[in-house]
Swiss-Prot record:
GO-annotated molecular function: calcium ion binding; collagen binding; endopeptidase activity; metalloendopeptidase activity; zinc ion binding
Disulfide-linked positions: 284-471
Organism (species): Bos taurus (Bovine)
Entry note: cofactor: Can bind about 5 Ca(2+) ions per subunit. Binds 2 Zn(2+) ions per subunit.
Gene from which this protein is expressed: MMP13
InterPro entries cross-referenced by the UniProt entry: Hemopexin-like_dom (IPR000585), Hemopexin-like_dom_sf (IPR036375), Hemopexin-like_repeat (IPR018487), M10A_MMP (IPR033739), MetalloPept_cat_dom_sf (IPR024079), Pept_M10_metallopeptidase (IPR001818), Pept_M10A (IPR021190), Pept_M10A_Zn_BS (IPR021158)
Binding site for Ca(2+) 2: 162, 194, 196, 198
Binding site for Zn(2+) 1: 172, 174, 187, 200
Sequence positions that bind Ca(2+) 5: 293, 337, 385, 434
Superkingdom classification of source: Eukaryota
Protein name: Collagenase 3
Residue ranges annotated as propeptide in the record: 20-103
Compartments reported by the entry: Secreted, Extracellular space, Extracellular matrix; Secreted
Ranges annotated as biased composition (Basic and acidic residues): 273-283
Amino acid sequence: MHPRVLAGFLFFSWTACWSLPLPSDGDSEDLSEEDFQFAESYLKSYYYPQNPAGILKKTAASSVIDRLREMQSFFGLEVTGRLDDNTLDIMKKPRCGVPDVGEYNVFPRTLKWSKMNLTYRIVNYTPDLTHSEVEKAFRKAFKVWSDVTPLNFTRIHNGTADIMISFGTKEHGDFYPFDGPSGLLAHAFPPGPNYGGDAHFDDDETWTSSSKGYNLFLVAAHEFGHSLGLDHSKDPGALMFPIYTYTGKSHFMLPDDDVQGIQSLYGPGDEDPYSKHPKTPDKCDPSLSLDAITSLRGETLIFKDRFFWRLHPQQVEAELFLTKSFGPELPNRIDAAYEHPSHDLIFIFRGRKFWALSGYDILEDYPKKISELGFPKHVKKISAALHFEDSGKTLFFSENQVWSYDDTNHVMDKDYPRLIEEVFPGIGDKVDAVYQKNGYIYFFNGPIQFEYSIWSNRIVRVMTTNSLLWC
């Protein structure tokens, strides 16, 4: 990620707007006129350069397709220049109000603070949390950045601080209005005088310290990144990615992309509690290994660490998402997954628990324990799973064994477990992930995948794991 000039304090003048002929995907017949108007507004807000007076540059009107392409590229979508369901879904996700483009040539250089000791002041509070909860969230959010830089943050209670923090609704005094519940959550301004560094939070949102509503700590940590001079990142695993995703209750660790960005401005600190920071996986890494694979309504989901790639059958470029985008109830990292097409369900496993999802929605009464499937107590995790729709059987792989589950009678088959090498000779004694396609089973073991013929019961081809992602 590169720290660039931000547009947080460039004001919008909607009197200068015009109609943009937004192209659509011919297959997306369910898109409404309201959807197209929303998409136009989104692109104007986040992908059109403005001049210092806040007026949209008229040269941008002829480049609507380019802006749509830029937005699709930024979020790792298939770049078509046409509005489709996937693009619209991304546009409708809750996000930061700072634009994603860096074409704001009104500043001579990248902005950063010229000092390491900064002050902040909480001007007012949200009624959603106690004062102490709000103060704790902001204190933690600043610590995210001070842990990896020489920066120090001190709270003051009166006067003007470097970073003034406030809650407001709709038009709240900076000519950059909020939009009510969801949508735009907050915005912040880059280092500088007046509004410079200030962070504003939409009080029409429900702010929480949990997975419900919007977690104030996570949003604040992101906004304070802007207050320090960081732009949005294209890395979906970065804190500075513009879309909000709840990342879990466990201790937050600043991703490597954000560390590199902030240290390029202020240098490293000497009190970083972590020797390593989480990195987003590279799909073309020759040593790539996988955690799980499953199909979902014709698409393929490929899980690695706290992410999954979404691979469309007619596309080469895979889209990368956080696993938590399924929902905050899911774990950050999973062990196994499989689809049950006739029930329109996928099952996701982590440790001794599993979840059932219909599409991207988690079913009630989950998670359940894997012991309910018939696994004995000594089985601590499922490493891979594969469902056969025609026979109603599901194979579960755990350590060096494979189990066969009868989905019709909801019992384990009597002749199992068996050794993996005995049932599928040649693939090794463990399976990281597995899926089937066109009469072949694909077993993944570290950086290697085996193409196994169901008809001849033998390996017919050995490939690299990353070839699944067209590398």
